[in-house]
């Protein structure tokens, strides 16, 4: 049973990622699971049991039933991307706050409809990008904004890849055009794009151009691709995402005075700590045989895993709205929209034989 200070969350769908977020809800001090829904009552029951849901959790055999539950404040929605626009809008119309898995939609037009519904009904929306809630990320932003240690940003490289096995490449929803049809771009690319935007203080690039050589499956879903991003003042970024390459998740940001590197930015090597390296005004010794000042490593200890930090922040925002009459925080849908815009631009460039795509006015 929820306490007065806990936000009551319903889980809409029993996707694999929902196991991780269910644990995060258990760990977050200001949230609890109050309901779960699947299109099969038996599946919802089995999922609740397997994930140690509270005995008081209501089990729903349809998404509609979960939406009608008056004892649910907010929904976590891990449905396939193609279903987001339908169910997120329905959730908003029922006054439910929404923690929406990424990518948030198949395109920005769909996401704008979701945001319009949220704004019309006064509900909070946040996407499920977990790493931005890790305490490490605040320190990354602090270094990037330090004019003495980092200077002015010149370029960012970000990548996320993993090697899907034969079963994944044949059967996972992320390779199915009718489910998560954005493929590696929407899944892995979302993270790499978010990292480049974060480093650029969420200023959208002027142009986006996909690199030739994107790999698509027989159904036309992207399995691997890369792109370059360019800003008006000469800043650049490159992103790479793939279901066909070794597990890698890196950010390198280079400024006029400093360099930032993160080797595990999406999922830390260890759940309870996260590291990054920085260097400032690096140079060689007189004989150019070694560095005078090699990069320094910084480690951040975490009380909660980053996904629980995400739930805690989401629940805090919902609590402010529910209990204190606060307005929804527009920062979260705004950065979701910018990420989706760049995802859309990369896909458009791939579809148009790697043409340069302008983001002016979007």
Curated annotation (Swiss-Prot):
List of residues that carry N-acetylalanine: 2
Pfam families according to UniProt: GFO_IDH_MocA, GFO_IDH_MocA_C3
Enzyme type, top EC level: oxidoreductase
GO cellular component entries: cytosol
Keyword Transport: no
EC annotation from Swiss-Prot or TrEMBL: 1.-.-.-
Name of protein: Uncharacterized oxidoreductase At4g09670
Entry keyword set: Acetylation, Oxidoreductase
């Amino acid at each position: 049973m929820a306490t007065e200070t806990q936000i009551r969350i319903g889980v809409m769908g029993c996707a694999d990622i929902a196991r991780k977020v269910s644990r995060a809800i258990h760990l977050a001090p200001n949230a609890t699971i109050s309901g779960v829904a699947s299109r099969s009552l038996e599946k919802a029951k089995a999922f609740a049991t397997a994930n140690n849901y509270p005995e008081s959790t209501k089990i729903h055999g349809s998404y509609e039933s979960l939406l009608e539950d008056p004892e649910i404040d907010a929904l976590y929605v891990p449905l396939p991307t193609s279903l987001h626009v339908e169910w997120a809008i329905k959730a908003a119309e029922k006054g439910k706050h929404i923690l929406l898995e990424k990518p948030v939609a198949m395109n920005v037009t769909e996401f704008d409809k979701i945001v319009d519904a949220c704004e019309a009904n006064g509900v909070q929306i946040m996407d499920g990008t977990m790493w931005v809630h890790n305490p490490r990320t605040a320190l990354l932003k602090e270094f990037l904004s330090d004019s003495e240690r980092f200077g002015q940003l010149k370029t960012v490289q970000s990548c996320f890849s993993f090697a899907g096995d034969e079963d994944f490449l044949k059967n996972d929803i992320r390779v199915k055009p009718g489910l998560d049809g954005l493929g590696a771009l929407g899944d892995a690319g979302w993270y790499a794009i978010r990292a480049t935007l974060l480093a650029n203080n969420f200023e959208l690039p002027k142009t986006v151009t996909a690199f030739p050589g994107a790999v698509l499956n027989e159904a036309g879903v992207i399995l691997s691709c890369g792109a370059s991003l360019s800003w008006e003042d000469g800043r650049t970024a490159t992103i790479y995402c793939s279901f066909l390459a070794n597990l890698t998740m890196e950010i390198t940001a280079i400024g006029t005075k400093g360099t930032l590197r993160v080797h595990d930015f999406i999922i830390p090597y260890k759940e309870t700590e996260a590291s990054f390296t920085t260097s400032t005004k690096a140079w060689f010794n007189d004989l150019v045989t070694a560095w005078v000042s090699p990069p320094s490593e910084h480690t951040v200890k975490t009380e909660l895993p980053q996904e629980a930090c995400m739930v805690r922040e989401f629940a805090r925002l919902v609590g402010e709205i529910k209990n204190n009459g606060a307005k929804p925080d527009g920062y979260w849908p705004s950065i979701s929209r910018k990420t989706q815009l760049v995802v859309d631009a990369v896909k458009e460039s791939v579809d148009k034989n790697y043409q340069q795509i302008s983001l002016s006015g979007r």
